[in-house]
Amino acid sequence: MSSFDEQNTRLPSMTLVPMVVEQTSRGERAYDIYSRMLKERVIFLTGQVEEHMANLIVAQMLFLEAENPEKDIYLYINSPGGVITAGMSIYDTMQFITPDVSTICIGQACSMGAFLLAAGAKSKRYCLPNARVMIHQPLGGFQGQASDIEIHAKEILKVKKRMNDLMAIHTKKTLKIIEKDTERDHFLSAEEAKKYGLVDCVLTERKDVKNFSKK
């Protein structure tokens, strides 16, 4: 996780969720704002990536695939990173399902958040102009017997190699460059993330999406 926003991630999440009321032939129907956005095939990945959040995102993607396998899914990311296994469950589902998953960075996409941002469908990875992106190597700390520490150290090196391989594929950078740039926290602006290959387009207005998709 990035120390850049560590203090903010410790704050309790906002419990007040806005409700949206729609008029239907059967009368009024109320949705929380996230359920309403899900109807528009929009999913939010916000905060630290952990198992419960990952399960919810996977379930939403599978639901939207079952509802319409031809329409894109839009994954909005504002995350400081989190647990690798949780993030990889989201990543694998993104690659597994039939619909394209378009990724949009709002705020920040750090660590696993940046990895998932880069994993969006080709030519459908976006970043808002003042968002920040950060890539680095996996973090891990272990306690116990020396033999157990050695086992975990070997495992995290395997995970690091696998994530670097995948990042090289999605960014079209060489593995050597990825290994060098992720050795320490590597922050990028929206434009720098575009040049690096983490996103395809920096959006300033809604119409930018349509204009870019026509290219």
Curated annotation (Swiss-Prot):
Source superkingdom: Bacteria
Alphabetical list of PANTHER family matching this protein: ATP-DEPENDENT CLP PROTEASE PROTEOLYTIC SUBUNIT
One GO term of the biological process aspect: protein quality control for misfolded or incompletely synthesized proteins
Its biological purpose: Cleaves peptides in various proteins in a process that requires ATP hydrolysis. Has a chymotrypsin-like activity. Plays a major role in the degradation of misfolded proteins.
The protein's name in its UniProt record: ATP-dependent Clp protease proteolytic subunit
Alphabetical list of HAMAP family matching this protein: ClpP
InterPro entries in UniProt: ClpP, ClpP/crotonase-like_dom_sf, ClpP/TepA, ClpP_His_AS, ClpP_Ser_AS
